[in-house]
Amino acid sequence: MNALRGWLAALGSMLLASAAQLGMRWGMSRLPLPEAWAGQTPERAALLAVALAVAAYAASLLCWLAALRHLPLGRAYSLLSASYALVYLLAASLPAFDETFSTSKILGVGLVVLGVLTVNARRTAAAPAHHPSRKAP
């Protein structure tokens, strides 16, 4: 059950971090450049999107801490890599982001997904490896 909690927390962290990236991109693309902040009134929706994205990052961090409690770092961290693929696919699919698909980017996303699957593939039952910090019985 603890492993399931870890996987759910890692998935939550990945989804929240991805939403945060998209929200920040959308909001920041609608705000004026910092040097123009004094002379312009920022768009409220853009400010709200950035604020919600920061909150999503905070929630993502809490999920990440829960994931680390229950999963090995190597497995949990690979799911964060999947968020890069998810952000690209969503940004290229949604018209609000004006991103495009390309063969090289799709190949890169495929490699990231393949890496995540490889890291998280179940190992066959083998003799447990000796760990140098553990004493033999």
Curated annotation (Swiss-Prot):
Family: Belongs to the ArnF family.
Function of the molecule: Translocates 4-amino-4-deoxy-L-arabinose-phosphoundecaprenol (alpha-L-Ara4N-phosphoundecaprenol) from the cytoplasmic to the periplasmic side of the inner membrane.
UniProt record, GO biological process: lipid A biosynthetic process; lipopolysaccharide biosynthetic process
Transmembrane regions listed in the UniProt entry: 4-24, 45-65, 77-97, 101-121
Pathway(s) per entry: Bacterial outer membrane biogenesis; lipopolysaccharide biosynthesis
GO cellular component: plasma membrane
Subcellular location: Cell inner membrane
Chief place of localization: membrane
Membrane side Periplasmic: residue ranges: 25-44, 98-100
Cytoplasmic compartment segments: 1-3, 66-76, 122-137
HAMAP family documented for this protein: Flippase_ArnF
Stored Gene3D superfamilies: 1.10.3730.20
Protein name (record): Probable 4-amino-4-deoxy-L-arabinose-phosphoundecaprenol flippase subunit ArnF
Quaternary organization: Heterodimer of ArnE and ArnF.
UniProt KW keywords: Cell inner membrane, Cell membrane, Lipid A biosynthesis, Lipid biosynthesis, Lipid metabolism, Lipopolysaccharide biosynthesis, Membrane, Transmembrane, Transmembrane helix, Transport
Entry-linked InterPro entries: Flippase_ArnF, Small_drug/metabolite_transptr
Highest taxon, organism lineage: Bacteria
Gene Ontology MF term list: carbohydrate derivative transmembrane transporter activity
Entry membrane topology: Multi-pass membrane protein
